[in-house]
Curated annotation (Swiss-Prot):
Its main location: plastid. Keywords: Chloroplast, mRNA processing, Plastid, RNA-binding, tRNA processing. This is Maturase K. The keyword DNA-binding does not apply. The keyword DNA-binding does not apply. The gene is matK. GO terms for cellular component: chloroplast. Usually encoded in the trnK tRNA gene intron. Probably assists in splicing its own and other chloroplast group II introns. Pfam families: Intron_maturas2, MatK_N. It is found in: Plastid, Chloroplast. One of its GO terms (molecular function) is RNA binding. Belongs to the intron maturase 2 family. MatK subfamily. GO terms for biological process: mRNA processing; RNA splicing; tRNA processing.
Length: 504
């Protein structure tokens, strides 16, 4: 986002922070294309992997400059000369580029919100893995947890109203509405419906950016609820219809309760409430009682109904004890267990046996859903037996090996924080043997004969960077390297959840 910020600062006097001119910049489409490749590294069909080029981008921008081609109706889109034979390609490129542009206000606002605050290495907070050290630190002291799915679909008009609070550029808002109203029948943009599924995997990037705006607004309101939880018991849900009046009413209520009801505020205060969200799933945890958790649950349900006009069933939001419940979040299965230990104490002639139980935050990889994701991607069957990939048999040997190795390292990198690495060893075995079966099928040979001819080279390709570094540092002390590799490792360069790990 530094490139975007630099562009806005250079043209601030001329463009007044307008986002609309960015749609005519070539580097926007290059960045959108790179982001698309990074997101779809595990997918078989990349949207325009081999079709997008600087020549096509220049042709697209030139046609947008020459005529007012952005005013196109759906009925004549097949005959429109601007789209021509590249209708789906152009629409995909425009929507992907516009999705990158829509993300600019959120990025700049998040950076500005961190300025002036003493947050060490705030750029690391962008990593998904930064959530898990927070969970390890906080959840050991909490009692109850609730898995919450943010309800959807949200109507398009509600998304646009939410987006107005973030994007002040009227031209960009009109362009956003144009995409969803004029091109709603194009599969490359969104599904043909007036209300979109905010967290559907088939939604386009522009729809996902708008849905992220709605989820960010919900998360901001949840943080506001957390800070003002003492006073919300008397707040009417009707005040949530307009946030300006809502803030005004809350401010008035604060003055009233501070002056008149100071003695009873502690009954409703919950200083140990924690909220974590990624995409459409959130985790709410508390050290308080089930009564307080139920109060929060109904606050959120009423908020969704009154502010986003979406229906959520309170009975489907479960409150569980952390001590006997595991929750699935971001491709990991997390739980708080007890690690028993026995201490023998000697005092004069008497000895005592003391049983201690220390809480431990355990994070493992759910192997069954992950194998299901691999089976859906045709790397194995539903039982976890590796199979060949006939769709990749036309590629060269180096391309086939490189693709399997990248997928394996990607999964190992993402799941490096697992307490138990045996599940990862099984995933590596599936991918390695699936790669061998694919190569053997291409060369019309058996797997045994192909592996014998290839030797240990294929195994070395599937080693992760961590294993390679540890083998260099401890070439002879294999037990030491294995012990270090079994430890949890969190990385600060993971900005999106792995596609195969996203089995929620």
């Amino acid at each position: 986002m530094e490139e975007f910020q630099g562009y806005l600062e250079l043209d601030k006097s001329r463009q007044h922070d307008f986002l609309y001119p960015l749609i005519f910049q070539e580097y926007i489409y290059a960045l959108a294309h790179d982001h698309g490749l990074n997101r779809s590294i595990l997918l078989e069909n990349v949207c325009y992997d081999n079709k997008s080029s600087s020549l096509i981008v220049k042709r697209l921008i030139x046609r947008m400059y020459q005529q007012n081609h952005l005013i196109i109706s759906v009925n004549d889109s097949n005959q429109n000369p601007f789209l021509g034979h590249n209708k789906n390609l152009y629409s995909q490129m425009i929507s992907e580029g516009f999705a990158v542009i829509v993300e600019i206000p959120f990025s700049l606002r998040s950076v500005s919100s961190l300025e002036g605050k003493e947050i060490x290495q705030s750029h690391n907070l962008x990593s998904i893995h930064s959530i898990f050290p927070f969970l390890e630190d906080k959840f050991l002291h909490l009692n109850y947890v609730s898995d919450i799915l943010i309800p959807h679909p949200i109507h398009l008009e509600i998304l646009v109203q939410t987006l107005r609070y973030w994007v002040k550029d009227a031209s960009s808002l009109h362009l956003f509405l144009f995409f969803f109203y004029e091109y709603y029948x194009w599969n490359s943009l969104i599904x043909p419906x007036k209300s979109i599924s905010x967290f559907s995997x088939x939604x386009x990037x522009x729809x996902x950016x708008x849905x992220x705006x709605x989820x960010x607004x919900x998360x901001x309101x949840x943080x506001f609820f957390r800070n003002q939880s003492s006073y919300l018991r008397s707040t009417s849900s009707g005040a949530l219809l307009e946030r300006i009046y809502f803030y005004g009413k809350i401010k008035h209520l604060v003055e009233v309760f501070v002056n008149d009801f100071q003695a009873i505020l502690w009954l409703f205060k919950d200083p140990f409430m924690h909220y974590v969200r990624y995409q459409g799933k959130s985790i709410l945890a508390s050290k308080g009682t089930p009564l307080l958790m139920n109060k929060w649950k109904y606050y959120l349900v009423n908020f969704w109904q009154c502010h986003f006009y979406v229906w959520s069933q309170p009975g489907r939001i479960y409150i569980n004890q952390l001590s006997n419940h595991s929750f699935d979040f971001l491709g990991y299965l997390s739980s708080v267990g007890l690690n028993p230990s026995v201490v023998r104490s000697q005092m004069l002639e008497n000895s005592f046996i003391i049983d201690n139980a220390i809480k431990k935050f355990d994070i493992i990889v759910p192997i069954i859903p992950l194998i299901g994701s691999l089976a859906k991607a045709k790397f194995c069957n539903v039982l976890g037996h590796p199979i060949s990939k006939p769709a990749r048999a036309d590629s060269s040997d180096s391309d086939i090996i490189d693709r399997f190795v990248r997928i394996c390292r990607n999964l190992s990198h993402y799941h490096s924080g697992s307490s138990k690495k045996k599940s990862l060893y099984r995933i590596k075995y599936i991918l390695r043997l699936s790669c061998a079966r694919t190569l053997a099928r291409k060369h019309k040979s058996t797997v045994r004969a192909f592996l014998k001819r290839l030797g240990s080279g294929l195994l070395e390709e599937f080693l992760t960077e961590e294993e390679q570094v540890l083998s260099l540092i401890f070439p002879k002390a294999s037990s030491t390297s294995r012990r270090l590799y079994r430890g949890r490792i969190w990385y600060f360069d993971i900005i999106s959840i792995n596609d195969l790990a996203n089995h929620e």
